[in-house]
Swiss-Prot record:
It comes from Arthrobotrys oligospora (strain ATCC 24927 / CBS 115.81 / DSM 1491) (Nematode-trapping fungus). The lineage of its organism: Eukaryota, Fungi, Dikarya, Ascomycota, Pezizomycotina. Keywords: Cell membrane, Glycoprotein, Membrane, Transmembrane, Transmembrane helix. The keyword 4Fe-4S does not apply. Glycans are attached at N321, N326. Pfam families: Fung_rhodopsin. This is Receptor GIN3. One of its GO terms (cellular component) is plasma membrane. It comes from the Eukaryota. Residues 121-134, 203-227, 284-292, 350-411 are cytoplasmic. The gene is GIN3. It is a multi-pass membrane protein.
Amino acid sequence: MSGFVAGEEAVKSALSAATWIGAASPKYSHLVLSRVFNIYSEYIYANGFKLTRENLIEDFGTRPEDVDPFMKIFGGPNGIATYLTALPGLLPILPHPRNIPIIVPLFCVFTVMTSLAVGLRLWSRQKVAGGIRSFDWLALAGFGLTIIYGAVSVYHSKVSGPYQAFYDRTWDQMKENYKVYLVLTIMYPFIMGLIKISLLLFYYRVATLNYVQWAVYATGSLTIANSIAAIITHCLAFMPIDFWNHFLQSPFKFNSRTPMLVFGAVYILTDVAILIIPMPMVFQLKLYPREKVIAVIAFSLGGVACVASGFRIWAIDEFQNYSGKNSSGLMIDAWTMIELNLTLICASAPAIRALAIHYAPKILSTLPSAFSSSGATRGSKSAGSSGKSKTPESEKSMQVSQSPVIPKEVV
């Protein structure tokens, strides 16, 4: 038998059986479900190849309202004994894939990187742009929630255990896994919406072109609508929402995989829009070539977050519904963590660039000194009135506010 491996359909059947048997056996919720398979088989043989309603309630702890649905799944009172005694014979050829221990390293690395990026952003806003603005506080809130998301993902990794397959876990693990994953699924659209809105508010504050402001309105409205729809959809996918306690009562109202793919695709669309919105303002600036290249790069880093969003959609498509090949959602957690952190890091890049120019102008700019927000405005006015050679106003503005024009709240 050791040379044979169960086919995909057989594996999927065993995975499904594990969830139903676990939900119907509260007395054995602490045991690995493959062991519970054997307990059922041994019990049925010892009981004259029978498994009655009373047996389930008294000896396995099945709730009375769960007995009939449980028996129906396995073919009724006659079929259930046959199925459950045959199931242990499948165990020797079932695969036992392990979870990749990637969540904790990702959490540690990105916590350090994102903390540094957000810290430098706030320092830049305070030192160069004259103070921390409302959109910076929103980004800071998004950063805090991203850290919480990562910490919950670490817990999700812990409760999932070392193995992917449901039959290699206990029902207690399964219930906690369902609970934590639902929390993560609801958290994601809220955090992503918060980060995107903070960036759009920044663009709105620095925009002078009407069509750019309208683009901000449209993208912001789409982002908010998508986030609200995602949260509501995830909450309505299960009724009651604590479906792990009502697993045999058909709590699954619809498959959330397709909506998650749609919401993810809309977020990518907004990523592209946010990437394009500042470009007209950047290209209109009369900067030295090296400075313009740096500005374009700083505002284009969001493309990296777009790529991460694409990989997250791939992970949802691959891992959201269990199959004979995959039965763990930890890769979705991993790509979501990567996407959220990269979005924050990329959103902080323009501010970090301004801070670098402020303290090291010879490295990132041909200008000999740093500027304050008030100095940039007064300098351009005096240049026009006196005719003296001055640094272009547009270049100062970019250094002060990380944008093509001086923010409205700075001047």
